Amino acid sequence: MSKRSNFDKIPRDFYPTFDTNATPPSFIREIRGKRYAEPCCGQGDLVDLLYDAAICKWESDIEARGCGYLYDAMCLTKNELQKCDLIITNPPYTRKVVLPMIDHFISLKPTWLLLPADWMHNRYFGPYMDKCSKVISVGRLKWFKDSPHSSTDNYCWYNWRYKATSDVDTVFIGRG
């Protein structure tokens, strides 16, 4: 998960989003009352976290984990998302997987993704930051329920508008 640890990576980047720190008030204000799709839902932890703020109208994952449809996020179309205002997910962090996902998701709906904060400083992510309209800082998160430790990396919610282009000024919201 982290570049500063030597732990083995979990298959398919399955890191459940159960930590309430992943949903700061500034993020909740952005999504309150909206209907959304969670296309990398895993066991539904993020949907549970957002239950009081927004309404999940589509849940799916590429692997059956007891929640939502068994469905590849890269196969989503506007048809599956017709009842959704936006996409919210904690996607896999493998670059060759997530970068095409960003392109695909923003071609369908406005999108919020929980990603490592330092990605915004990397060249490979530059074209995505050029299109990113908002970044909300989250800080360090806990990925393992039985562990007393949080991650060694910081995280952010990144927002892209529907069909975002590279003429966007990014608004940054720190931890308040």
Each PLM stretch: what is its role?
Residues 1-176:
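Class I S-adenosyl-L-methionine-dependent methyltransferase catalytic core
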